[in-house]
Amino acid sequence: SGMGLPFAALLIRPEYDIWKPAEHNGTFRGNTHAFVTARVAIEKYWADARFAEDIAAKARLLDVVLGEMAELVPGSRRKGRGMMQGLDVGSGDLAAAICARAFRNGLIIETSGNADQVVKVLAPLTTPEETLRRGLSILHEATRETMKTNKMAAE
C-alpha cells in the first residue's frame, strides 16, 4: 500500500480494460486498511514529480555502484532496472559470501536467481539517499573484500 500493508492492484489502460467488477483476483484485494494507507501514500508521495525524480536519482546511484561492483567480479552481469537491480556473480557461494560479509558490517541483503547467484538490491522507494549511499558503500566494500579474500585463497 506504500505504508507497509499488503495491497494488490492492477493498472490497465482503459482501452484494454474489458474486465467486469471483481474479476481482478489478488491475494490482498479488499484490505480496507491497505486501501486507506495506499490513498495516503499516493497523496503524499505522488502529489508532484519530486518522488519520481528522487527514485530516478537513487536508481542512477544504484547503477553506478553496481557498475563498480561488476568491475570487481570477473564475468558478472548486472540485472534489473530502476530500484530493483542486482549483480549476477555467477556463483551462489560467492553471492552468499558477499551478503554474509555485508551482514557482518550492518547490511541485510539477499540473494536471488536460480542458483542464488544474484546479489539483489531491493531497497524501499522511500529510502533516504544518504541511507542508500551507506548501504551501497557497505555492499561495495563487502564485494571488494570478498573478491580479495577469494583471490588470495586461489593463489
Predicted segments with their positions:
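Conserved N-terminal phosphate-binding loop of PLP-dependent enzymes in the Aspartate aminotransferase
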Residues: S1-E155
